[in-house]
UniProtKB/Swiss-Prot annotation, chain A:
GO terms for molecular function: transferase activity. This is Mannose-1-phosphate guanylyltransferase regulatory subunit alpha. Gene3D superfamilies: Hexapeptide repeat proteins, Spore Coat Polysaccharide Biosynthesis Protein SpsA, Chain A. GDP-alpha-D-mannose binds at residues 85, 248. It is found in: Cytoplasm. Residues 357-385 are annotated as: C-loop.
Swiss-Prot record, chain B:
Belongs to the transferase hexapeptide repeat family. It comes from the Eukaryota. Pfam families: GMPPB_C, NTP_transferase. It comes from Xenopus tropicalis. Residues 2-222 are annotated as: Substrate-binding domain. It is an enzyme of class 2 (transferase). Catalytic subunit of the GMPPA-GMPPB mannose-1-phosphate guanylyltransferase complex. Catalyzes the formation of GDP-mannose, an essential precursor of glycan moieties of glycoproteins and glycolipids. Can catalyze the reverse reaction in vitro. Together with GMPPA regulates GDP-alpha-D-mannose levels. This is Mannose-1-phosphate guanylyltransferase catalytic subunit beta. The keyword Magnesium applies. GO terms for biological process: GDP-mannose biosynthetic process.
């Protein structure tokens, strides 16, 4: 029997995802029309013998999360539970804290996945690889190739070219170490907890030497820095390298990029989710997702890479490209929406133009990843995708360029390169 | 009667339009700038127009030949070998201007207003002195040279360049009428009429100011060209409302050539001029723009305060604003944003221009 854990973080995380994470927990933000973690859940549901999925995070239990989990259980026919940490315990602390829950029922192995990644999830190949590389005594990290400069933003893995054993692991190094990076998707045997326990005990000893230490801090464990770093070179940690699509989803801009990756997978995984140009319907270019309840005028032109949410209204002569339109939004006639996330229940007036600048990976470098690091460079807002928060109103005929509009704002003029509070 | 129009040089400030045609032939409200002046002159009884030009232009010459026939008047070209400024051209054309002893008009070429030529003749004859300058009121006199004159008679006392304290709010509008005697003051060399001739005439009590009623604009650069268009269309509204286009989707003063085609669900105006053979596709929004002959605006584009030069093409969902000027035969690809772009003729634009700049 197998299990999976998805690390979903909590409300204090995902700041680069503001203002969208104000309205919905980031793991539920729709990417290619479905909540970010639904892609993980669906991939898990396809793994034979995977019996339970545990979401671990420090969100207060909330309506959005529970109703999503309920729906997902029914749709994917797999048990799903949310386990709440009493505070942020780090990427290793949460699974250690809930180790009994994870191990109950006796799984031979379990996956651990960061919620904020987009991937083709090669879970079955990882299982096969695990069997061939040590089985119950070994652990597998999904790795991929990055370019030299961008590798510094990730966990970097040096591996034996033949055995794929991880010889050295370093998280976000200051100088180049390796172009193989950690994808935030792991396959562990239950024995991993012995190694996490070592870290836990070491923390405890160190903290006893300090004054005023709180017992809580002993529970904060980072999988990457505390566990992988010490496991490297001990014949237990292996990297399974994938060529499949992969990206982090840190910024709102990377959500548009991740949508593009998932939409292009839909061609083979979910052709029914892709819209096509039909008699009496809108013109579709490339990959487009339209929620069945959305109302799209036949004279609108959508795509490539557009996701239209529930109950969205798209008026006559509207153009949408490289954008996510969240549920309840209204795009009035002749408006033009490019490289933008239109927030829930927002309105874009007639002939308005809402446009952002994509931060796409360098198309000429197959190993390039999306940069989603800083909002500001030299004190200036770096041109990014435009984000309209929830319930924002854009008047007719204005242009909103490279801007972030916080929720519930009614604008009365054009804005460029600004954060509008 | 005769009139001399100071056509001057290359019209660089109205580029990129003047890279395709000489400035006097640039269409202003669906008629070459020069014809606005020439037709008004003809109406006031002028039968000989002299164009003072400092460059050769076959296009201008050919066009003027046709206008000669059409209007039944004589049009002469007075070519300078070197630019003679605003006064020198009068000396060069001396023979033509003194064929009889009538007073003659002198005009700056890019001025648009309700030309008061008949009133000028009356006013000039009434005071009987050498020269009359038409003056117009401005809001910010400190930016201009102002004319100080006696309110009753109009006799000019002096000129003050960029006054720092208020002395007058009237400026020289570039429309004059002179008696032939003025030619004795002007030598055949580069001379500025404003700086070198007028002050002396004023001192001798030979120069009078006549105040212009109604609008006035020097349309020598794109921004002012558009402002002038708004003023001109407003005066059309008063004098010839039947020239303006009305109907669903049209707002305010809009001039549309009868050969233009307008699509469904457009919203056009206020202050728009659409030239002959222009095609405006469905769902286009235009305000405060001039669209010149043969251009096409593709569906759902949005244009404000822009000039689309001859035979250009603006793509679907393009947004153009802030005095964007397209030269002749420019193609703007779909979905682009042009903010204050100045695009030279025969260019194809495939990237947005988010900040004002020149596209070579
Ligand atoms: N449950 C839980 N998840 C976390 C915690 N910290 C980070 N995560 C999740 O782990 C993943 C990786 O986060 P993190 O290591 O902080 O960011 P990265 O190193 O920039 O990828 C994300 O999906 C986070 O939501 C935590 O304290 N508890
Ligand atoms: N023929 C001729 N016309 C000129 C010359 N210089 C200026 N002009 C014209 O005289 C008018 C007034 O010119 P100027 O005083 O330079 O004003 P501006 O060009 O409107 O700033 C304009 O119509 C010019 O085209 C010249 O050297 N020769
Ligand atoms: Mg991390």
């Amino acid at each position: 029997m197998l299990k999976a854990v998805i690390l979903i973080g909590g409300p204090q995380k995902g700041t680069r995802f503001r203002p969208l994470s104000f309205e919905v927990p980031k793991p539920l933000f729709p990417v290619a029309g479905v909540p970010m973690v639904q892609h993980h859940i669906e991939a898990c549901s396809k793994v034979p013998n995977l019996k339970e999925i545990l979401l671990i995070g420090f969100y207060q239990p909330n309506e959005a999360l529970s109703s999503f989990l309920l729906k997902a259980q029914q749709e994917f026919k797999v048990a799903i539970r949310y386990l709440q940490e009493y505070s942020a315990l780090g990427t290793g602390g949460g699974i250690y804290h809930f180790r009994d829950q994870i191990l109950s029922g006796g799984p031979q192995a379990f996956f651990v996945m960061n919620a904020d990644v987009c991937s083709a999830f090669p879970l079955v190949p990882m299982l096969d690889f695990h069997k061939q590389h040590g089985g119950s005594q070994s652990y597998v990290i999904l790795g991929t190739t990055a370019n030299r400069s961008q590798s510094l933003n990730y966990g970097c893995i040096v591996a034996n070219g033949e055995t794929q054993e991880v010889l050295h692991y370093v998280e976000k190094p200051g100088t180049f170490v390796s172009d193989i990076i950690n994808c935030g998707i792991y396959l562990f045997s239950p024995s991993i907890f012995q190694h996490i326990a070592e870290v836990f005990q070491r923390n405890q000893q160190e903290l006893q030497l300090e004054e005023n230490s709180s017992w809580q801090r002993t529970e904060v464990i980072r999988l990457e820095q505390d566990v992988f770093t010490t496991l490297a070179g001990r014949g237990k940690l292996y990297v399974y390298k994938t060529e499949g699509c992969w990206s982090q989803i840190k910024s709102a801009g990377s959500a548009i990029y991740a949508s593009r990756l998932y939409l292009s997978q839909y061609g083979s995984t979910h052709p029914e989710r892709l819209a096509s140009t039909k008699e009496g319907g809108p013109t579709i270019r490339g990959n487009v997702y339209i929620h069945p309840t959305a109302n799209v005028d036949p004279s609108a032109v959508l795509g490539p890479n557009v996701s239209i949410g529930m109950g969205v209204t798209v008026g006559a002569g509207v153009r949408i490209r490289e954008s996510i339109v969240l549920h309840g939004a209204v795009l009035q006639d002749h408006s033009c929406v490019l490289n933008t996330i239109v927030g829930w229940d927002s309105t874009v007036g007639r002939w308005a133009r809402v446009e952002g600048t994509p931060s796409d990976p360098n198309p000429n470098d197959p190993y390039s990843k999306i940069d989603s690091e800083t909002l500001f460079r030299e004190g200036k807002l770096t041109p990014s995708i435009t984000i309209l928060g929830c319930n924002v109103s854009i008047p007719a005929e204005v242009v909103i360029l490279n801007s972030i509009v916080l929720p519930h704002k009614e604008l009365s003029r054009s804005f460029k390169n600004q954060i509008i509070l | 009667m005769k009139a001399l129009i100071l056509v001057g040089g290359y019209g660089t400030r109205l580029r990129p339009l003047t890279l395709s045609v000489p400035k006097p032939l640039v269409d202003f409200c669906n008629k070459p700038i020069l014809l606005h002046q020439v037709e008004a002159l003809v109406k006031a009884g002028v039968n000989h127009v002299i164009l003072a030009v400092s460059y050769m232009s076959d296009m201008l010459e050919k066009e003027m030949k046709e206008q000669e026939k059409r209007l039944g008047i004589r049009i002469s070209m007075s070519h300078e070998k070197e630019p003679l400024g605003t006064a020198g051209p009068l000396a060069l054309a001396r023979e033509l201007l003194t064929e009889n002893s009538d007073p003659f008009f002198v005009l700056n070429s890019d001025v648009i207003c309700d030309f008061p030529f008949e009133e000028m003749v009356r006013f000039h004859k009434h005071h009987g002195k050498e020269g009359t300058i038409v003056v117009t009121k401005v809001e910010e006199p400190s930016k201009y040279g102002v004319v100080v004159y006696e309110a009753e008679s109009g006799q000019i006392q002096r000129f003050v360049e960029k006054p720092q304290v208020f002395v007058s709010n009237k400026i020289n509008s570039g429309l004059y009428i002179f008696s032939p005697a003025v030619l004795d003051r002007i030598q055949l060399r580069p001379t500025s009429i404003e700086k070198e001739i007028f002050p002396a005439m004023a001192q001798e009590g030979q120069l009078f100011a006549m105040e212009l009623q109604g609008f006035w604009m020097d349309i020598g650069q794109p921004k002012d060209f558009l402002t002038g268009m708004c003023m001109y269309l407003q005066s059309v509204r008063q004098k010839h409302p039947e020239w303006l286009h009305v109907g669903p989707g049209f707002i305010g003063n809009v001039l549309v050539d009868p050969t233009a085609k307008i699509g469904q669900n457009c919203s056009i105006g206020p202050n728009v001029t659409i030239g002959p053979g222009v095609t405006v596709e469905d769902g286009v929004r235009i305000k405060r723009c001039t669209i010149m002959k043969g251009s096409r605006l593709h569906s759902h584009s949005w244009l404000e305060s822009s000039i689309v030069g001859w035979s250009s093409s603006v793509g679907q969902w393009v947004r153009m604003e802030n005095v964007t000027v397209l030269g002749e035969d420019v193609i703007v690809n779909d979905e682009l944003y042009l903010n204050g772009a100045n695009v030279l003729p025969h260019k194809c634009i495939s990237e947005s221009v988010p900040e004002p700049r020149i596209i070579m």
